[in-house]
Amino acid sequence: MIIGIGNDTEAISRVAEIVERQKSFITLILTPAERAAAAERKGKHQNEYIAGRFSAKEAFSKATGYGIGEKVQWQDIEILNEPNGRPVMKVKNFPYHTYVAITHSGDQVNTVVVIERLTLLEKMSIKLFPKRGVLS
C-alpha cells in the first residue's frame, strides 16, 4: 500500500553554485558512499549526481510529510546505483520500502519518491526472490 509520494525539482546549476560556495554542503548532504560515487564523476555528470541526490532526499521529506532534521537526517538517507544504473534509496531505521526515480533534462533534475508499506507476503517474497520483487 502506498503511504507517501514526494516530488522535487532543482536547478543543477544552483546546487553546483552552493557546492562551490560551501564546501561543507557535500559532507552534510551526501553519505560517504555517495561522496565516493560523486568523486568518480567529473564536471556536468558530477553536478547532476549531487543535485539528483539532494533533490531525491528533498522528495523523500515531502513523501513522509516531515522535513529533514525532524525525524530523519541527511546522512540517514542513502541513494546508490545498482550496476544497471537504477538508483536505490535506503533509509536508516525506516520501516517502509522506498522507490526513487531521478531524471535530468537540461539544467533541471526532477525526482519522485514513493513510500510503500509492504504486506507480510511481499516481505517474504523479497527474502526468497530478492531480484524478482522490490529491492530492500
UniProtKB/Swiss-Prot annotation:
Enzyme Commission number(s) of this protein:
2.7.8.7
GO biological processes: fatty acid biosynthetic process
Kindly state which keywords UniProt assigns to this record, in alphabetical order: Cytoplasm, Fatty acid biosynthesis, Fatty acid metabolism, Lipid biosynthesis, Lipid metabolism, Magnesium, Metal-binding, Transferase
Task: Tell where it localizes.
Answer: Cytoplasm
Q: Which reaction does it catalyse?
A: apo-[ACP] + CoA = holo-[ACP] + adenosine 3',5'-bisphosphate + H(+)
Which amino acids does the record list as binding Mg(2+)? D8, E58
Q: Name one GO molecular function term.
A: magnesium ion binding
One GO cellular component term:
cytoplasm
Write down a Pfam family by its short name: ACPS
Cofactor(s) it depends on? Mg(2+)
Q: Which InterPro entries match?
A: 4-PPantetheinyl_Trfase_dom (IPR008278), 4-PPantetheinyl_Trfase_dom_sf (IPR037143), ACPS (IPR002582), Ppantetheine-prot_Trfase_dom (IPR004568)
- Enzyme's top EC category: transferase
Major localization listed first in the record, in broad terms: cytoplasm
Superkingdom of this protein's organism? Bacteria
State the similarity comment: Belongs to the P-Pant transferase superfamily. AcpS family.
Primary role = Transfers the 4'-phosphopantetheine moiety from coenzyme A to a Ser of acyl-carrier-protein.
The name on file for this protein is Holo-[acyl-carrier-protein] synthase
Q: Organism source for this protein?
A: Leuconostoc mesenteroides subsp. mesenteroides (strain ATCC 8293 / DSM 20343 / BCRC 11652 / CCM 1803 / JCM 6124 / NCDO 523 / NBRC 100496 / NCIMB 8023 / NCTC 12954 / NRRL B-1118 / 37Y)
